[in-house]
Structure formats: C-alpha cells, structure tokens
C-alpha cells in the first residue's frame, strides 16, 4: 500500500510544485 502511495505522491508532487511556482 505504502509503495503505491509513495508512487502517487512522487507523480503528484512535481505538478503541485510547478503549479505553486507559476502563481
């Protein structure tokens, strides 16, 4: 379970960071 959660976080985090950096 944690492996899948970490994978999802790894995929979502860069998008969130780039979104915050744009604003």
Swiss-Prot record:
State the Pfam families in the record. Answer: Antimicrobial_4 (PF08024)
The UniProt entry lists the main location of this chain as secreted
Q: In which tissues is it expressed?
A: Expressed by the venom gland.
Q: Which UniProt keywords apply?
A: Membrane, Secreted, Target cell membrane, Target membrane
Which cellular component appears as one GO term in the record? Answer: membrane
User: What exactly does this protein do?
Assistant: Membrane-perturbating peptide with multiple activities. It is insecticidal, since it induces contractile paralysis in insects (L.cuprina) during several hours, and death after 24 hours. It shows antibacterial activity with higher activity against Gram-positive than Gram-negative bacteria. It is also antiparasitic, since it potently inhibits the larval development of the major pathogenic nematode of ruminants (H.contortus, IC(50)=5.1 uM), but fails to reduce the motility of adult males of the other nematode B.malayi.
Q: What is the name of this protein?
A: M-poneritoxin-Nc1a
Native organism taxonomy: Eukaryota, Metazoa, Ecdysozoa, Arthropoda, Hexapoda
């Amino acid at each position: 379970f944690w492996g899948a959660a970490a994978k999802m976080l790894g995929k979502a985090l860069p998008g969130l960071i780039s979104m915050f950096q744009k604003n």
